[in-house]
Amino acid sequence: MNSLQSLCVLCARLNECALDLECLKFCDPVIVLSDMANFKKNGIVILHLYQTFFEGIKEQNLLCASALTVYMQVLLKAMYEQVLLLDAALESFMVDQDRKKYFEKVLCLRRCAEHLSINISLNNGVEFIVQLSTLNDIEQLISKINSVYALLLPQEGLQICGKIIDLLTIMCGACMVAKPESYLETKTCMKCYEELTLTPNQGKSLRRRLHGKFCNHLTEQKAFFNIEKNIETIEKDLGEAILNYGTVQSVATEIKKIFKQQRSAESLHVSDAEKTLKKYNIFSKVPDVIYSLSEFTYWSKISETIVRNVAITLQQLNSCHTLYKQLQNDVSLYLYGEVSEDFLALSENLLTHDERLYVGSIYVSPSRLIDLVTGLSIKNLEESPIFKRLAEEDEVQHKIKSLLHDIRDPQTTETPGRLNTINCMLQTHNLQQEVLARKKAYFQKVSESGYNRVMACIREQESLINKVVSVNVYGNFIFEALSKIMNGFVLRKMYLDGSFRVDSCTYDEHLYIKNNLMPKKLPLELLPDLSEIMYTLLTGPLSDFHKSAYPLPANISMAYGCDHAEMLPHMKEDLARCIEGTIHPSVWMVCEYNEFFNFSGVTDVNDMQKKMWNFIRELTLSVALYNDVFGKRLKIVRIDEEGDLSGNVVLTFNHESPLLFHTGGGMTKFKDVYSLLYCDLQAQLSRETVDVPEGVSYSVRTPNLLDLVRENEQDGSIIPGCLFDE
């Protein structure tokens, strides 16, 4: 077992312990005190694990972070603080015996620490404050950091990530079950954008496609079914002695009786149709009427799923809750000699009837509540005179019944055919009957349209309630995104702290390259590829759709990153125009000597972004023009690119050393693009220089047209001899 596998095993065991620790917060403190020895023993184990692993994992995240190590840092710190808080609260409860004060202290009800104001400072001193209070705010901040990734100093970026981890420790706590107030289910994340890239947009904008979508990445929904029906499992766990105590056995029997009353799953006409269809198979001669019956039976089953038949009522849920509570009290009397008063028992009397419906019960699965709410909504709809169609027999059911009647009692007389043209022309036109028929058809159409809209609304609200009421756990996307951003800043910090040679080029070398490139023009056919290179350099480490298994163009990755960071449309237009480029160097050669990636004097974030785009454009187009003029193959790579970086221009985004280039003596840092290009040109010339021994002379022959003549063409028939140099 390697270290990563060992860390995964430790994380799994810590999760198991964290769930038990979280449940203790809601338990009756008297019950916890009755087994205080085990609590102390497990608490010592948690303290030992914290002291053993926490600092090492924290250092690991500052070198090479992963979603697992970031989560482990959050989990260990939260469990450590939770154990100390529980121990202090239990000590106070032993003195005052006040359950209300105990729960206020354990659950932190008198204070809210799940808010954070982060002061972000860019590399030129521009500062602004960001307020964080939910997981969506954290994810949105990470997306915005990804958008201005190049404008943040690596130390500042790592400091911000550290504050986010501290907030996640407070917000998530020791348990992965998400608090309802810690997230907004209707706000999408970057992962939602990534999912939409795999499906066609059908001409719809991204914002329209995201409208009404519920995010299941920051918090993942977990479905729990039939919790209330696990009475058999509870009986096995209680044992024979507890079952024979008081009314335990009788209460368990009453709970079993509640859910024995089930409604019929199918309508009567569907059952009759299926009995008739069983007589036919693929080898039978199937009449047309049987084929029609089969088709209508299929559509009838599909339509019945729209209106859900809820197999449980509100009265049954209330009875179930009351009986389970009585069972809990009886078991508590047997084990501890008194009725337990946990947090839920103390706060139950404070809830209204509507609040109880949405808060639910610990004895009933959330899916039951969702079915109940949906059923009550549809029942209320049925009582409306406008939508009586819900309670009436629909056309599919009527057609199935008529087909069954025709099969059982076939008619001997043929149905009258359609009247011929002459008879139709001779018939008297009944205007009143036609008006009534058209009015009925119009009302039917309006009713169906309204019905479909109402049912679509019910389904949408059902999805929302399902997300809110069901159990949600914290997803791993927030930890993955945070680890990617941290690794980018860590890599930049390594290059910032590294010892590199300083370029020895002067202003004359800068001017030499610039003067050689300025009169030239960039080939027009290179601009599309150069635009993709610029988008690749500007895209933050989080928007890596162009590196995925199904890669997208770099401009799409940049567009999704800008959209989710909520960049204004006019800024996106400025970015697109800047990246388009031009073949004339006088337009984009604007950087002064040793001023590359220098933002001094800029006091606005938007202006800083525009200046950064101009820097990247000048770097990309200058290198491309240099390659075209001098016949080079120099490439620009980011520091987070995989592979060998030697021989390429390395872009670090650091203010002190924005460019690195590997020369013969090692890495050299540059703050000027054209000095770097001169260094590459000089290194190439030095490699091509050959030392000539003393006393050896070479005569250089003047080239002439005879060098191009084939052997069989030297007779002068093709190239006149007068053109040859004698």
Swiss-Prot record:
InterPro entries membership: UL28/UL56
Any one biological process term the GO annotation gives: viral DNA genome packaging
Transmembrane parts of this sequence: none
GO CC entries: host cell nucleus
Positions contributing to ATP binding: 626-633
Compartment(s) where it occurs, according to its Swiss-Prot or TrEMBL record: Host nucleus
HAMAP family reported for this sequence: HSV_TRM1
Main function: Component of the molecular motor that translocates viral genomic DNA in empty capsid during DNA packaging. Forms a tripartite terminase complex together with TRM2 and TRM3 in the host cytoplasm. Once the complex reaches the host nucleus, it interacts with the capsid portal vertex. This portal forms a ring in which genomic DNA is translocated into the capsid. TRM1 carries an endonuclease activity that plays an important role for the cleavage of concatemeric viral DNA into unit length genomes.
Family per similarity comment: Belongs to the herpesviridae TRM1 protein family.
Quaternary data: Associates with TRM2 and TRM3 to form the tripartite terminase complex. Interacts with portal protein.
Protein name: Tripartite terminase subunit 1
Protein species of origin: Human herpesvirus 6A (strain Uganda-1102)
